[in-house]
Amino acid sequence: MTSTAQPAPPVPQTKAWIITGPTSGMGHVAALELAKHGTVVLVGRGKLAEVEAEINALPDGHAVSVVCDFADIHSVRRAAAQIVALGLPLAGVANNAGMMSTTDGRKSPHGWDLSFATNHLGPFAFTEALIPHLPDGANVVFTCSGVEDSECKPAVVSGFRGGRYISAETSARGEWKPGGSTKAGYDAYATSKQGNLATVFRLAREIPRLHFRAVEPGFNPGTNLGRDASPFLQFIAKRVLSPMAPMIKYWSTPKIAGRLIATTLTDTSDATGVYYDENGKLMQASKQVSDPVFSDRYVAETRELLATVPAEEEKRVPR
């Protein structure tokens, strides 16, 4: 008897979501949330293998890891190329990796200010390398910060004086507009996060087929952002301040912030060029970065600076 059974249809590939900085804090929470929506591409350093195993152990969980040092543009370009080579159906990118140095003078492999390179230059280069491979309607999310706004009262009280951008070149040298913060690392952090917002606003105008979104996760004392702070200060932040966060305005927790990042990345609306606060409500950026002339200049100068980093020479295969 001849069987009339039809072959089973191929199993469709699930969407793949890229998230950087997924090994701790809000990034870790976001990665676990994204696992509910498809494959998670974990990009960063440190405990990538542990998070990958954690997600793969979940029912229907699937994750892959790509090592990347966002302060090193060569590493960033390699990571983007590796992701493209995976052949996954990419659906969106969450640029969450970042740092806040509490000391001045730290440099990237290219000799650039470490915070500016890690928070802005690296994620910008990463995003630009992936854009041609993202489908229409894909979301690109940047974790930003209200400290870029010199009129943000909580940020000012904390010692920030807003973004101190002069040019991409001077920022890379660790030089900032006079009148900034007296606290080491604050101007670098605020200026780099202003760069993230400039990127969102400029690319939303430049590339309408994609959706660019910014998220202000609120003050999160439970993250590893200030990981070069003293062990005592890290203990106070995570064990004393973090539990209080839900009760204080403008504060948040890694769990709340991580879910917000995942929700913003997987949202199917057409929203682009938008900026969400820690509660997922629309918020206003600084007057400076909201000016298209300023954000256009910031992005143009970023591209010019990154163009000075030559492509890596292909490794010759011995014959």
What are these regions (language model features)?
Residues 68, 115, 249, 287-290:
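Pocket-edge positions in alpha/beta enzyme catalytic cores
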Residues 17, 32, 274-319:
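C-terminal helix-and-tail extensions that cap enzymatic domains
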Residues 86, 267-269, 308-309:
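Generic structural signal for alpha-helix termini and adjacent loop/cap motifs
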Residues 79, 195, 199, 257-260, ...:
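Alpha-helical packing segments of well-folded alpha/beta enzyme cores
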Residues 239-283, 292-297, 304:
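C-terminal helical subdomain
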Residues 2-221, 312-317:
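Rossmann-fold NAD(P)H-dependent dehydrogenase/reductase core
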